[in-house]
From Swiss-Prot:
UniProt site (Transition state stabilizer): 325
Compartments, record wording: Plastid, Chloroplast
Subunit architecture: Heterohexadecamer of 8 large chains and 8 small chains; disulfide-linked. The disulfide link is formed within the large subunit homodimers.
GO annotation terms (biological process): photorespiration; reductive pentose-phosphate cycle
Any one GO MF annotation of this record: magnesium ion binding
Enzyme Commission number(s): 4.1.1.39
Full protein name: Ribulose bisphosphate carboxylase large chain
UniProt xrefs under HAMAP family: RuBisCO_L_type1 (MF_01338)
CDD domains per record: RuBisCO_large_I
Needed cofactors: Mg(2+)
Biological source species: Cephalanthus occidentalis
Residues annotated as binding substrate: 114, 164, 168, 286, 318, 370
Functional description taken from the UniProt entry: RuBisCO catalyzes two reactions: the carboxylation of D-ribulose 1,5-bisphosphate, the primary event in carbon dioxide fixation, as well as the oxidative fragmentation of the pentose substrate in the photorespiration process. Both reactions occur simultaneously and in competition at the same active site.
Amino acid sequence: SVGFKAGVKEYKLTYYTPEYETKETDILAAFRVTPQPGVPPEERGAAVAAESSTGTWTTVWTDGLTSLDRYKGRCYHIEPVPGEEDQYIAYVAYPLDLFEEGSVTNMFTSIVGNVFGFKALRAXRLEDLRIPVAYTKTFQGPPHGIQVERDKLNKYGRPLLGCTIKPKLGLSAKNYGRAVYECLRGGLDFTKDDENVNSQPFMRWRDRFLFCAEAIYKAQAETGEIKGHYLNATAGTCEEMIKRAVFARELGAPIVMHDYLTGGFTANTSXAHYCRDNGLLLHIHRAMHAVIDRQKNHGMHFRVLAKALRLSGGDHIHAGTVVGKLEGERDITLGFVDLLRDDFIEKDRSRGIYFTQDWVSLPGVLPVASGGIHVWHMPALTEIFGDDSVLQFGGGTLGHPWGNAPGAVANRVALEAXVKARNEGRDLAAEGNEIIREASKWSPELAAACEVWKEIRFNFKAVDTLDPS
């Protein structure tokens, strides 16, 4: 080997290894790389591998004290992106030794830390990660998962129904609890704190928790069904978050909520461990995700954030609607919905899945469809998301002309109609409107809802689309 030689060096000499055969313990990453002009693709791919593992910008003599070959990330494959000039997918393999066990925080600090501010790249985006079985096994994952949740709630054979309480800011705790009661009484399974309801001057968290618990018990007694309200425990410190979760448990609440990106993965994993130890379900909101995942050329795709959440832990996570007001293309969305729910997912580039992922029975996460959806969307949502999902109608419940409880009734009737039609073998995509119309004949609440929302559409092209194949 060559002795120590100072100076700046090309990354590709060390970090571009097309002959490398990936190990099943490696963490694999697919980056979409948009380089500065004049930098050859191998150098860019190698640069990403280096900066996100052992490399630094110059030769350092301490390299001689370790085995670079053992610890370095390797760019093992580069492919041009069809239809894009000068853009590549760089595949990088990281040896498992580089990562702390059971820490999503550490995994991200390594893989998407410094490298994203790197000058040689105009833009870089992490499209997908393959988490090896050996690493997955160091995580607890979701506190309970889909099957345990159904058993706890005694609800089978249909999607679950939720509603975010609006107006999201400004209600007093008692009025807030009243809205919760009306929705649950009308037929919803859950109501939800908005993600930015934490503990503000107009409604402190403890007051809200108390009135919501009262609403849950009252609605359960009247309907004979198990009800829940996602009590948002997100707080300014981890200690305060756990304090809120403890109080929720003392009230006998079935589920709490956390904003996992603004709260951070460390806090989220702590909350998930607390929830499993104490029998609480954990609803996860993805506030801030679009800052990270919306641009096609830079940032991180949501499927990576979704995988990270399954490792860190949550029983529900918001995953777009495909039909409402928020971003989500159908194939891409279904790709990461499967990554959240299923145990084994095959590589399938037509759905944006770059790697085969085996979760080795880590519990699944229920995808939550929420944002600009209403009764007319119900057949499409039932068709797209299937039974293992939570459909959330905020305005689509509370905007009902007769009030909150009738709004909840309308949604529950629409859902039961769609599930019944599906079980009879009808085509929900083609006959959706007809199914809702038929159901509205015997439900005045649904008929009124159909009238209000018959013209509402959110038609914009998605910003983040699949590459042409």
